[in-house]
Amino acid sequence: MIEFDNLTYLHGKPQGTGLLKANPEDFVVVEDLGFEPDGEGEHILVRILKNGCNTRFVADALAKFLKIHAREVSFAGQKDKHAVTEQWLCARVPGKEMPDLSAFQLEGCQVLEYARHKRKLRLGALKGNAFTLVLREVSNRDDVEQRLIDICVKGVPNYFGAQRFGIGGSNLQGALRWAQTNTPVRDRNKRSFWLSAARSALFNQIVAERLKKADVNQVVDGDALQLAGRGSWFVATTEELAELQRRVNDKVLMITAALPGSGEWGTQREALAFEQAAVAEETELQTLLVREKVEAARRAMLLYPQQLSWNWWDDVTVEIRFWLPAGSFATSVVRELINTTGDYAHIAE
């Protein structure tokens, strides 16, 4: 299995280094749910600004403040502890009056707004995230500048970031150990993390192999294509290749790669043979996913950061802003720009 740092680059390995997350303020994330609170219902949506706190810790503290069980507080996604982040939490408080959440006190945390809502906020139920990153001690400004220009046109590989695999790859290692036994994993969190790491690693491997081709965005017979921003896909046929290629070039369609699991992967013929060959040696992880009935799915091979802009504060410091859809990783954008240094270079966003 290819280590994250050794995955194929779309724009070639960066020539320079830089410091990511010299302090939390250098990594700002604003969650975009894509909808507004209903204004009524048994749930309360709470928008929180946090610095130096992980999401679960804040959720547990909010539950304690509201005198409800921790499981009654949900969120759409985990946000990094070592960053400044805005995100929504959701507390179920049926039959209770609206509490005064301005009285909620937690170091590094501030309630920005709150309102009633009809539905529970579930994991993954967000549109995306807006990022503002500051890269410091950049050793090669010209290289980073050109890469930013190229990313605007060609995007970046839509890799799952290193944080998906746990500290030191612990989640992937757990999946491999599990794959080698028939012992049930009772811990739901471990089970979820390990299966997710297994499938993500296989996806990354398929994309890395595809990126070795001379023309990464060349549609081949049997490719599974999806409309940009949509989840469903269809299979490319030989007769349609020219027209489909035009639509891929226009970024109307996206070539996808497999998230392997049980059931059909979605590609056919030449494209399916390529994907199967790319992960042919990873039989243990594939068997685990089938055994645990994790359904196969698709994910876009490339990622195009939206609203990408940047501002050089000086020759060694650049502020970069962009928006990514849910499930995408800012660190997968940064790895195409610089070789990152710093203790938190790969921490989750």
UniProtKB/Swiss-Prot annotation:
Domain TRUD residue range list: 155-303
Record's GO cellular component terms: cytosol
GO biological process: tRNA pseudouridine synthesis
GO molecular function ontology, one term from the record: RNA binding
Keywords tagged on the record: Isomerase, tRNA processing
Residues the entry annotates as binding substrate: 27, 129, 329
Keyword tRNA processing: yes
Top enzyme category: isomerase
Known function: Responsible for synthesis of pseudouridine from uracil-13 in transfer RNAs.
Record protein name field: tRNA pseudouridine synthase D
Phylogenetic placement of the source organism: Bacteria, Pseudomonadati, Pseudomonadota, Gammaproteobacteria, Enterobacterales
